[in-house]
Design a protein with these regions (language model features):
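Intrinsic, low-complexity polybasic segments
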Residues: 14-15
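N-terminal hydrophobic or amphipathic helices/low-complexity stretches enriched
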Residues: 21-59, 99, 314
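A non-catalytic alpha/beta surface segment that caps or lines the substrate-entry region
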Residues: 51-99
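Catalytic-core environment of secreted peptidases
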Residues: 78, 82, 94-127, 132, ...
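Midchain, well-structured core segments that form catalytic/ion-binding scaffolds
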Residues: 115, 161, 166, 170-329
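Short glycine/serine- and small hydrophobic-enriched flexible loop segments
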Residues: 133-141, 277-284
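Short helix-loop-beta-strand segments that form the rim/entrance of peptidase-like active sites
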Residues: 139-160, 291-301
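Short, conserved charged micro-motifs
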Residues: 329-335
Length: 336
């Protein structure tokens, strides 16, 4: 996977060919035309999808939802216009193939996910689809045939648990079918049913096709953070490891409900105070971890008092979520 600085359409549109198809550019002596053509096309592609899936300040494309499906169908339409071979796997992932000279060789795959987080960034996932599509489009226009099959992949439901890729590998677990992205979301099993997907093959442990048929999978991705974007020199990063994620979706801190003006401090059992102190302690541990040279993150994404809470009532409980991420599994688990 490559990570690109956010909001840089030129990098998104051109990095794939510059880094992985440089030989083709040298042979064609047409790199300037490629950059100009792909940058303009990618900008239009991003805007087209943004309009389809706009949600407040960002975009929302939930896994196996209608907006994600619109992205997949838009990509399929583009692939058909380019004359690419179109197919879907058992998890609903889309594959668009530009045939190579030797079709007996394992294929090069490149792509990313069509979904997003709620009110997320438009380039998340979409950049990794735009880049190989731009490369395929350019090769079709210039009548360039790659040495082996080149396949653009559009994955489903990555943000909810990488279920597009997991389904391809046959590694979905039975308990996953009852998982929800949010408390109000349908379960994964219900989402599968809504798209006519049979979950049984996705839990078989057998990949949808032999992995030996894949020579490489290349994913370009925006950084989703400020490090590369704030650097004058470092604009492209190579991923050296994938973080493990430990999620506590609901932690409950119990207290005692009471009137705000009637209970002095020594007699209070305030869950908001206790939860805040606990989060503050996590913050101190995080700082100490970073100072020791180790890398991890934690995030409290949700913190709520009960629906019938009021400004003048000490609540009886607080619920919160914690997301802990680290490359070192033992470090991650020590926080969990």
């Amino acid at each position: 996977m490559l990570i690109l600085a956010p909001y840089d359409e030129f990098f998104v549109a051109t990095s794939f060919m510059r880094l992985f198809w440089q030989r083709l550019l040298i042979m064609s002596k047409d790199s300037l035309s490629f950059r100009e053509s792909c940058a303009a096309w990618a900008g239009g592609f991003f805007e087209r999808i943004r309009i389809l899936t706009a949600d407040g300040p960002g975009v929302t494309r939930l896994g196996y939802g209608n907006e994600e499906l619109e992205v997949v169908e838009t990509c399929e339409a583009i692939g058909r216009e380019l004359g690419l071979e179109i197919r879907y796997d058992r998890a609903g992932n889309l594959y668009m193939t530009l045939p190579g000279r030797d079709r007996t060789l394992p294929a090069v795959l490149s792509g990313s996910h069509a979904d997003s987080v709620i009110m997320g960034g438009n380039y998340d996932g979409l950049a990794g689809i735009a880049a190989p599509l731009a490369a395929a489009r350019w090769m079709v226009q210039k009548h360039v045939t790659p040495p082996r099959d080149f396949t653009v992949v559009v994955l489903r439901c990555e943000e909810q648990g990488c279920f597009g890729a997991t389904g391809f590998l046959g590694r979905v677990k039975p308990e996953d079918l009852n998982r929800r992205f949010t408390a109000q979301s349908p379960t994964l099993g219900e989402l599968y049913a809504s798209r006519g997907i049979d979950p049984a093959p996705l839990m078989s442990g057998v990949p949808a096709e032999p992995l030996a048929r894949i020579a490489a999978f290349i994913e370009l991705h925006i950084e989703q953070g400020p490090v590369l974007d704030s650097s004058t020199f470092e604009r492209v990063g190579l991923v050296s490891g994938i973080v493990g994620i430990l999620m506590h979706r609901k932690i409950t801190v119990k207290g005692a409900r009471a009137h705000a003006g009637a209970v002095p401090r020594p007699f209070r059992h305030d869950p908001v105070k206790a939860a805040s102190q606990w989060v503050s302690r996590l913050e101190d541990l995080w700082q100490a971890t970073l100072e020791s040279g180790q890398d991890m993150t934690y995030t409290v994404g949700m913190m709520n008092t009960p629906p019938k809470s009021a400004f003048n009532i000490i609540p009886n409980e607080v619920t919160l979520s914690v997301d802990i991420r680290a490359i070192d599994e033992s470090l991650r688990d020590s926080f969990g």
